[in-house]
Amino acid sequence: MLSMKEAIENYVEGCVGKVDCPAYKLFMKAILAGMMIAFGAAGSSVAAHDIANVGIARLVAGVVFPMGLMMVVMTGAELFTGDCLAIMATVQKKHTALKLIRMLIVVYLGNLLGSLMLTCIDYVSGQYNYSSGILGAYTIKVALGKCNLDFTTALASGILCNILVCAAVMLAA
């Protein structure tokens, strides 16, 4: 097992290859990651949508959702939230800030496209009609809840999520 210092050194060295990767390769890996995270989200909704106890439903969803992140880490796909950690290599002058920004934009757009692609496939597959439409209603309820968060709450939740994703990426380094 690597020490934290060794894990950081490994990750920083790996970032050099990431930022220099051709845009089309980054984009394809990012589409894949977006789909995998969407699989995790869809799986957590399927697992939790028909559980009456809110606490248990959230626990089940919380256990299933990280499967998407595990797929991303194991396949080497590119996820925006984890790639934000590449700023460590920028600070150490392993690459320029411009290269980091280019990578983050390409990965963000690829993640968005991948998640939208999987959402469309889920819709066409009829998945949202499961349980007499209860899964679709649950999905809408979750989406509305997230859309109605005030800016500060959404930002704080996003930061906390990013900390957890970066921790997972470092553990995998």
Question: Where is each model-derived feature located?
Answer:
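Alpha-helical transmembrane segments and their helix-helix packing motifs
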Residues: M1-A173
